[in-house]
Amino acid sequence: MDSILVKGNGELRGQIPIAGAKNACLALMPATLLSDEPLTLTNAPRLSDIRTMTQLLQSLGAEVASLQGGQVLALSSHALTDHRADYDIVRKMRASILVLGPMLARDGHAVVSLPGGCAIGARPVDLHLKALEAMGAELDLRDGYIHAKAPAGGLKGARVVFPLVSVGATENALMAATLAKGTTVLENAAREPEIVDLARCLRRMGAQIEGEGSSTITIEGVDRLGGATHPVVTDRIELGTYMLAPAICGGEVELLGGRIELVGAFCEKLDAAGISVEETERGLRVARKNGRVKAVDVMTEPFPGFPTDLQAQMMALLCTAEGTSVLEERIFENRFMHAPELIRMGARIEVHGGTATVTGVEKLRGAPVMATDLRASVSLILAGLAAEGETIVSRVYHLDRGYERVEEKLSACGAQIRRIPG
């Protein structure tokens, strides 16, 4: 099993290209199931989760070709051979549930295993299922599988009110509604850029959608969808992660492809901590203003609030801030599993339920640490960049699910980091 060796060595300077968004691409790929015409995705990230979704779609009979080194995906679902998404593939990734809505909408039936993925508390699929039931689907959960069937004549437009904001449930309902009979209104819908990106792609395919980016999305069902070519939106979580690298280490880094509107709430916290963020012709330039970072309080919220997927990385920054910071996690439970590993490096962190209190220290110390999930793994790498001595991060298979060539991108800016094959 691979590990990452990091040596803290001061400032970073250079440029880092930001890839297409993993979470956007994982929703865009199942959209091919809505049409029998080709869908081409450009600016696709080259990640293990994308390969897992490729395997899942191919198991259903879809064709998926990876072109230009994986940056272009050519998909076609003109002849599905199966409507059963098996546990062996689905268990690897929670986004697998996103094949349910498209298959149900196009062909009227689907069998999908309950999903797996990151070990971050309870992430139930109830909201997905209730949305589809509102459109008339009959659902039966047995033997670890969701057995879904559309009513005669197909899914029907409906008013769907999400009791909680859910990106995945919004995506599943949005895709299903494009082929439903009549009008569907999604209320308390997720507003994330990945939702906007999916809606734009579906519109290119012929869907009639209004309101994406707001909490109310209206979809007028159509008889069929066609093909399209669509660029995947920039990955705002990768962007935010690499913005934190010069914030932690000092120096100045330009993030190519970065856009301020993708990370607005995050940038506000960086500014309060003493980090400069400037727009450039090619992206964003980030630098630490003067001296030690200042403590700030952070509360995770659905977009446009502070993203939960940047909470672990932000904690790494605040470990060496001047003063005491409070981080409140309001999206997922059990999402401070990185805290004990940061404590091994000398951080002062107290966790009580969904709140972590971080008292900044002047310096972290390198140590062997273990990644527990995707975002925790990169937070430990960031901490290692600012620590004295060597840090070895084990179980970095988590990292490869969401970050493309992390050691190459950081080393290009002067970081001493390398992968140790396991």
From Swiss-Prot:
Residues with the 2-(S-cysteinyl)pyruvic acid O-phosphothioketal modification: 118
Predominant localisation class: cytoplasm
One example GO MF annotation: UDP-N-acetylglucosamine 1-carboxyvinyltransferase activity
InterPro entries per record: Enolpyruvate_Tfrase_dom (IPR001986), Enolpyruvate_Tfrase_sf (IPR036968), MurA_subfamily (IPR050068), RNA3'P_cycl/enolpyr_Trfase_a/b (IPR013792), UDP_GlcNAc_COvinyl_MurA (IPR005750)
List of residues binding phosphoenolpyruvate: 22-23
Binding site for UDP-N-acetyl-alpha-D-glucosamine: 94, 123-127, 309, 331
Pathway the protein acts in: Cell wall biogenesis; peptidoglycan biosynthesis
Catalytic residues (positions): 118
The reaction(s) this protein catalyses: phosphoenolpyruvate + UDP-N-acetyl-alpha-D-glucosamine = UDP-N-acetyl-3-O-(1-carboxyvinyl)-alpha-D-glucosamine + phosphate
Role noted for this protein: Cell wall formation. Adds enolpyruvyl to UDP-N-acetylglucosamine.
HAMAP family in UniProt: MurA (MF_00111)
Name assigned to this protein: UDP-N-acetylglucosamine 1-carboxyvinyltransferase
Organism: Cereibacter sphaeroides (strain KD131 / KCTC 12085) (Rhodobacter sphaeroides)
